[in-house]
Amino acid sequence: MVKLRLKRYGRKKRPFYRVIAIDSRCRRDGKALKELGFYDPIAGKTQLDVPNIIFYLKAGAQTSETVGNLLQKAKVFNQLSLLN
C-alpha cells in the first residue's frame, strides 16, 4: 500500500520535511516513489504538488495524520471532492 507521509531532512533542532509517496512497509527515510512537496514547521512554509497528490489519493494512497492535516489546511480534500 502507498502512503503519503513526511521524510525528515535538516539538521539537529532544525527539521525540514518533504511530503513523499512511499510504500508503507519502507522506513521513514527510505527511497520515495515520488516527492510531492515540502513542509518547514519553523518558517511555517508549505509547498505541495496538488495534481500529483490528487493522483495518488485517487489511486488509493493513505495519508499519515500529519500529512492529512497539511492537506486539509491546503484544501486539497475539497478539490478532490469537487473532482469526484
From Swiss-Prot:
Compartments in which it is found: Plastid, Chloroplast
Keyword Transferase: no
One family name in Pfam for this protein: Ribosomal_S16
InterPro entries: Ribosomal_bS16, Ribosomal_bS16_CS, Ribosomal_bS16_dom_sf
GO molecular function: structural constituent of ribosome
Gene3D superfamilies: 3.30.1320.10
GO cellular component terms attached to this protein's record: chloroplast; mitochondrion; small ribosomal subunit
Biological process (GO), any one: mitochondrial translation
Keywords associated with the record: Chloroplast, Plastid, Ribonucleoprotein, Ribosomal protein
Stored PROSITE patterns: RIBOSOMAL_S16
Domain of life: Eukaryota
Protein's recorded name: Small ribosomal subunit protein bS16c
The organism of origin for this protein: Mesostigma viride (Green alga)
